[in-house]
């Protein structure tokens, strides 16, 4: 008779993106202007906004840093649509993706924030690199 001692569970083992994602309340349409996005970012004290297309599907993520080149020219910022700017675009995370795999993808892409979408491309939330790291390390967040 062989006695097996229980194996310690690795921190983060079995976790998915759904376990770690946060809701995202701020979104902007891809046809909105750079000025409008900047107003929302400043007014809500945000670092990023999720961008959605005309059907409501996730188009990407825009940051203040990404808008900076357009904001230097006020006449340009008022006329340039978010869709014409360089911003983070897909592929995006999905809720059933393993959290360890998502962490690797975020590290390779150097992402601090990653949109999470459903199978139709609609925004479900965001994955924050700090939260992923904490959960995988086994720390309570």
Give residue spans per PLM region.
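Tandem CBS (Cystathionine beta-synthase) repeat/Bateman regulatory domains
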Residues: 1-141
């Amino acid at each position: 008779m062989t006695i097996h001692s229980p194996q310690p569970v690795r921190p983060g083992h079995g976790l998915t993106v759904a376990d770690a994602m946060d809701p995202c309340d701020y979104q902007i349409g891809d046809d909105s202007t750079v000025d409008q996005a900047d107003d929302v970012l400043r007014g809500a004290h945000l670092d990023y906004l999720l961008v959605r297309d005309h059907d409501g599907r996730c188009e990407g993520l825009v940051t203040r840093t990404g808008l900076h080149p357009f904001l230097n020219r006020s006449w340009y910022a008022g006329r340039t649509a978010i869709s014409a700017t360089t911003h983070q675009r897909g592929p995006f995370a999905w809720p059933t993706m393993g959290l360890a795999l998502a962490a690797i993808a975020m590290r390779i892409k150097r992402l601090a924030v990653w949109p999470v979408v459903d199978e139709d491309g609609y925004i479900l939330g965001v994955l924050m690199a700090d939260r992923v790291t904490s959960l995988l390390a086994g720390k309570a967040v």
